[in-house]
């Protein structure tokens, strides 16, 4: 496990949020011209990457296979008075997500996937683009 994952969860949540504010959002705005109205994060953990999108008015959905991480994400979002939907599941078991997302984040996830090619092909089913 990486050292940054062993920090207190609130601190890690805040670091993720700051990284998104400093890098993800400016990058997305530069290359697309605007922010999407919906953002999905697969392997969202505590939801820190999604917080800045929620603060800017995006609908955010976080999926993580670990129910404990989803509970932490829900609690952090309540503390920050932000709305977000968090689901404990394998992303590809959720049929209602097809063709709904202009932006899908998979930060620090793909290295844990055995069949990466199939994993990425499956994203065509849930992305708008």
Would you name each region that the model predicts?
Residues 117-129:
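A short glycine-rich, Lys/Arg-flanked "PGG" loop and its adjoining helix->strand segment in the class I
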Residues 1-99, 103, 107, 120:
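Conserved N-terminal segment of class I S-adenosyl-L-methionine
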């Amino acid at each position: 496990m990486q050292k940054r994952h062993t920090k207190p969860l609130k601190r890690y949540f805040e670091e993720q949020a700051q990284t998104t504010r400093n890098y993800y959002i400016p990058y997305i705005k530069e290359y697309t011209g605007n922010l999407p109205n919906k953002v999905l994060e697969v392997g969202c953990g505590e939801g820190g990457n999604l917080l800045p999108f929620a603060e800017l008015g995006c609908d955010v959905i976080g999926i993580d296979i670990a129910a404990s991480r989803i509970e932490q994400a829900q609690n952090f979002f309540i503390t920050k008075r932000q709305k977000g939907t968090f689901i404990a599941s394998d992303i590809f078991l959720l049929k209602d997500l097809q063709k709904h997302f202009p932006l899908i984040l998979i930060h620090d996830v793909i290295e844990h996937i055995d069949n990466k090619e199939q994993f990425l092909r499956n994203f065509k089913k849930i992305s708008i683009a």
